[in-house]
Amino acid sequence: MLEKENLNYVEKKIEEYGMLNYHVLEGMADWVRVVDGDGTIIYANRTMKESLGKDVVGMKCYKSHGKKKPCSFCITERSISTGEIVQKEEKINGRYFSVKSSPVTNSEGKVFAAVEVFRDVTRERKLELELIEKNKKMSKDLGFAKRIQEKILPNKEKLDNIAIDYIYRPSEMLSGDMFDVFYIDDENIGIYISDVSGHGVAAAMMTMFIRQTMRSIKDDIVSPSATLSELYRRFSTLNLDVDKYFTIFYGVFNKKTYEFKYSNAGHNCIPIMYNKNKMTTLEIKGYPMTLLFDEILYEEKNIKLSKGDKILFYTDGITEAKDKSGKEFGIESVMKIIESHKENILNEINNNIVIHSWGEQQDDFALVLMEVIK
């Protein structure tokens, strides 16, 4: 073990072993020290001494920054014994340091000490810790928002002469897919499915806007086409960028006449109407809800439903699910499942999507089934 020696001796040893230019070391903003094989500090630069408020030369390396026993993982010992450059992080007097230990050799090439450079990374670590805490809070808030989004989904229930069932699976914590079923008046029941561009918080907030606005409009307007035109008018007042848009398919079922009127605002996942004998798609044109247009008028069609008729609503997370080769699931696959499985359609489609898909789920998806039961 080396005894504490004066600075002149240290300078002499530095020059003797050709370690590093002394004046360069003394002028560095980082802490620099040289530790021998016994763990004794044989050199410390001015910055380190001034920061610690003492001359640490001659001290055991761990004692120089307040420890009572050697570190469980000693990078100095590792560096000297293996000749490797080793790095770890230390907390000294409340500050964080990235410490890098490099082997030092003499003129014969033998490792006899390690030079350690302490770089103060306190600011970076505090920012990281703050970011971690903020992320924790954000995750907690997102979890709360997710529960709210799930709770406002309609019940899987019977509404007079129709029954509603669905499967809802967001790709992230929050979804851009939304659907709803509600009474309009004593005769009419409204049902829609929508798909907001993007994912996450912004998309989820848009689904809230759609839900609240649709439930507000229904008190004054029954017609699906007029409802979508009014929805677009209110959407345009938000003054959003053109990359913020959504699609929506909206239908109104009259429980007395069994007439189903519907309109489409760019929802390219055309609902499928089927029963034991036939299957057809409810195709109708219509632009999505986007501020690319000053005004949009929507078409309206109607069909007559009967007991046993079913309408399957879905979003593009179904048809655009891709396998390993990039092949999409497609509407054809959905229709084949309907043809071969008259019962438990939602579960069959969901199971097939899981089997078909490769990797993580890339998009939200929703499946909603409306069935005329009497």
Each language-model region and where it sits:
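Conserved acidic
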Residues: 3, 120, 195, 316, ...
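Terminal output helix/cap of sensory domains in signal transduction proteins
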Residues: 59, 63-93, 349-355
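Active-site-proximal, acidic helix/loop segment immediately C-terminal to a metal-coordinating Asp/Glu
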Residues: 202-220, 305, 309-358
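Sensory modules in modular signal-transduction proteins
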Residues: 11-38, 46
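Conserved hydrophobic beta-strand signature of PAS-family and PAS-like sensory domains
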Residues: 41-42, 262
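… and, occasionally, acidic/histidine-rich disordered N-termini of signaling adaptors
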Residues: 130-312, 359-374
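Sensory coupling linkers of modular signal transduction proteins
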Residues: 2-11, 105-135, 319
